[in-house]
């Protein structure tokens, strides 16, 4: 009801949050979200996200059951009008920040990642926890996962990505659902854990594994923009022209001299990204999927 009061709002991005990763989403939970949206003149058409389990990423004996459950969740979401499902393939940690409440000059707070706060930390030895990490893991479990990914390596992670996509994308295409991959955030290794969805070359490789309109991107300008090597407006132009962007995250970041970054205001002058060129690229390529932006403290999501 509150969201409906904002002019121009038409749809909701949501998820089922009380189901353990790897299990099937209950149909009644999906239906409840769709019904609540419909009662308020909105539609539920984007899921963010159905988590990909560590067993899938690592290729353990549990992955086939987890993938089967993932596919069934896709079918159930499609039944209630979902057209796009965002997900990521980041090992162990989701997005990583060192602070969630950095005060800005205008009095707002934002998320930041400062290398000076990361340097010297060793999750294999230290008892640490950073924002964005799965709080359900014990410190011992985190250590075991880090060791497992170190042994798997980048090549092994790519192999398991391919296994997942070849099982999931055909189901999504059959259901008329776009699977929108979120880039690694930030787009470089942390604590030696492989991260592969980081740049144009690797995104091209990912999309080529299963060449389907259902194998697409959630192109987060902030995530890719954390690396100076990524020309974000050109990436937007390229993948939008290919019709391989299912979902946009429009976000600006300010890259600091040592490679640290702060999530900044959305205007181009507030950060390191040319947001004007990014929007221009979307318009000129006829982008017609879904985009959203969020406040810098991850408290509010606005569907555009």
Predicted regions and their residues:
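Active-site-proximal loop/turn and secondary-structure-junction residues that shape catalytic pockets
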Residues: 18, 50-51, 89-93, 183-189, ...
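Conserved, mostly hydrophobic/aromatic
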Residues: 12, 77, 182, 248, ...
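Active-site acidic/histidine proton-transfer and metal-coordination neighborhood
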Residues: 56-216
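Structural preference for beta-strand elements that scaffold enzyme active sites
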Residues: 10-13, 43-45, 83-86, 176-180, ...
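Acidic (Asp/Glu)-rich catalytic clusters
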Residues: 2-8, 28-45, 78, 170-174, ...
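Trp/Phe/Arg-rich N-terminal binding region typifying the photolyase-homology
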Residues: 3-7, 15-70
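Conserved small/polar residues in nucleotide/adenosyl-binding loops
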Residues: 293-300
């Amino acid at each position: 009801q509150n969201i409906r009061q904002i002019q121009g709002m038409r749809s909701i991005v949501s998820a089922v949050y009380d189901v353990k990763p790897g299990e099937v989403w209950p149909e009644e939970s999906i239906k409840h979200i769709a019904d609540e949206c419909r009662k308020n003149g909105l539609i539920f058409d984007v899921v963010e996200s159905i988590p990909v389990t560590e067993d899938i990423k690592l290729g353990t004996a549990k992955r086939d059951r987890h993938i089967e459950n993932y596919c069934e969740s896709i079918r159930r979401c499609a039944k209630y009008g979902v057209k796009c499902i965002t997900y990521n393939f980041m090992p162990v940690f989701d997005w990583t920040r060192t602070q969630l409440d950095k005060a800005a000059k205008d009095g707002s707070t934002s998320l930041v990642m400062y290398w000076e706060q990361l340097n010297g930390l060793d999750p294999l030895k230290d008892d640490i926890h950073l924002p964005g990490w799965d709080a359900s893991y014990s410190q011992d479990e985190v250590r075991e996962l880090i060791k497992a990914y170190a042994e798997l390596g980048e090549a092994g992670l790519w192999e398991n990505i391919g296994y997942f996509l070849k099982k999931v994308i055909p189901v999504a295409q059959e259901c008329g659902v776009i699977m929108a991959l979120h880039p690694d955030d930030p787009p470089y290794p942390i604590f030696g854990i492989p991260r592969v969805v980081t740049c144009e070359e690797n995104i091209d490789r990912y999309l080529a594994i299963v060449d389907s309109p259902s194998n697409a991107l959630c192109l987060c300008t902030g995530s890719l923009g954390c690396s100076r090597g990524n020309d974000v407006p050109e990436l937007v132009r390229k993948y939008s022209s290919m019709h391989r962007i299912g979902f946009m995250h429009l976000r600006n970041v300010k890259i600091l001299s040592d490679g640290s970054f702060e999530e900044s205001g959305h205007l181009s002058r507030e950060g390191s990204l040319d947001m004007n060129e990014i929007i221009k690229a979307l318009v000129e390529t006829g982008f017609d999927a879904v985009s959203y932006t969020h406040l810098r403290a991850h408290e509010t999501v606005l569907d555009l």
